[in-house]
């Protein structure tokens, strides 16, 4: 099944973007070629843009504290797996401590590094990081892969508490959902929400159907409309019945 996720609010939208960026960053950092490390570095700059939002850290701390207060009363409850509970609470408490230790504006260390700042300013220009534009960057790219990797890992280190916090919030949100099998009649599905607040919607569809869900929602109703991509033409709505799994997640 192919999984599509749709955020219901701006906070979850930001966390999903952050998750995607960190996954891309980790993939390219693990590679050996300097061109792949270039992608890791430019992705690091994107991460800095997202994490530089003034309220992101405080939002994550508030959400983690809320989750801690929700879960802590279950300690000693015989109906709850205590080892799993303690693992989650320990992870939350450690991440809260790491967030509290973060000083200043997130990503400021990249701004203060004049060499990285020069690369960052050129990276937004198409072809702007050629060897004749940034010979010092080209020289760095010729260093051994492990040395480049250590440098990039050092530069991302101050932002890792935000990655960990986002991962916990998204995991708890995803685990809160219960999947149900539904049918989009003639490619369209809608469901009343009865005023309930959700954080995230997941749509799982069989890959052989080759359909693409497009979703929207408000506090009263959600809509899922399936389309199909054919060649160079924009995705068009389908008029066939489409079975899929729908999960609504709410922290």
Swiss-Prot record:
InterPro entries: ZapD, ZapD_C, ZapD_sf. Gene3D superfamilies: YacF-like, YacF-like domains. Transmembrane segments: none annotated. It holds the Pfam family ZapD. The keyword Cell division applies. It is found in: Cytoplasm. Keywords: Cell cycle, Cell division, Cytoplasm, Septation. One of its GO terms (cellular component) is cytoplasm. One of its GO terms (biological process) is FtsZ-dependent cytokinesis. Its main location: cytoplasm. SUPFAM superfamilies: YacF-like (SSF160950). Interacts with FtsZ. Cell division factor that enhances FtsZ-ring assembly. Directly interacts with FtsZ and promotes bundling of FtsZ protofilaments, with a reduction in FtsZ GTPase activity. Belongs to the ZapD family. This is Cell division protein ZapD. It comes from Burkholderia cenocepacia (strain ATCC BAA-245 / DSM 16553 / LMG 16656 / NCTC 13227 / J2315 / CF5610) (Burkholderia cepacia (strain J2315)).
